[in-house]
Amino acid sequence: MRNLKKFLALALAMVMAFSLMVTANAAHAGTQYNDEDTVTPAFSEAVEVLTGMGVFQGDSGSFRPASNITRAEVAAIIYRLATGDTGTDKMDLYTTRHPFTDVRSDAWYAGYVGYLYNAKIIKGTTATTFNPAGNVTGYEVLAMILRAVGYDKNDEFTGATWTVEVASTATTLGILRDIDSTHYGDTLHLASR
């Protein structure tokens, strides 16, 4: 099961790194998105599978593939992938277990953020700020996924060169195989759904 989780997390990393078109704002499994015709056909199957697994959940039945994805939305996706928990029971235990003053305990994402912070999968934008509504970058998504599968144990993904370390690790693992390294900045800038 642990290897399956690692495989699924890396598969998601590849989808996000190559397309940056993945969203946390999907509807419940088995339902149609009211804007599914805007989903890039090459990613339809991945979206369908991850929705069916409960990894993608959301509100209003919209997928919004052209919208940017927030740090809170990615936290929800990473939590579901890392734990296999698509409910809220475990997550509810962590709503106040973080140092972030901008993550209220009653926010829908508070438990995800708290769990991932304690698991050392996410970091704040500062020691006390998470910026949940801020757009996430491809580098940040890759860092979270790599931490979820066991990388960055020695805090390599910190400091002024953290993006270089993330890209280097992802390249070594083959996640960025088809992306020219001179274009990492363009490709991994803002992640869209």
Where do the PLM segments sit?
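Feature responds to low-complexity, polar/acidic, surface-exposed segments characteristic
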Residues: 2-42, 53-72, 79-110, 119-139, ...
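Conserved glycosyltransferase catalytic-site signature
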Residues: 193
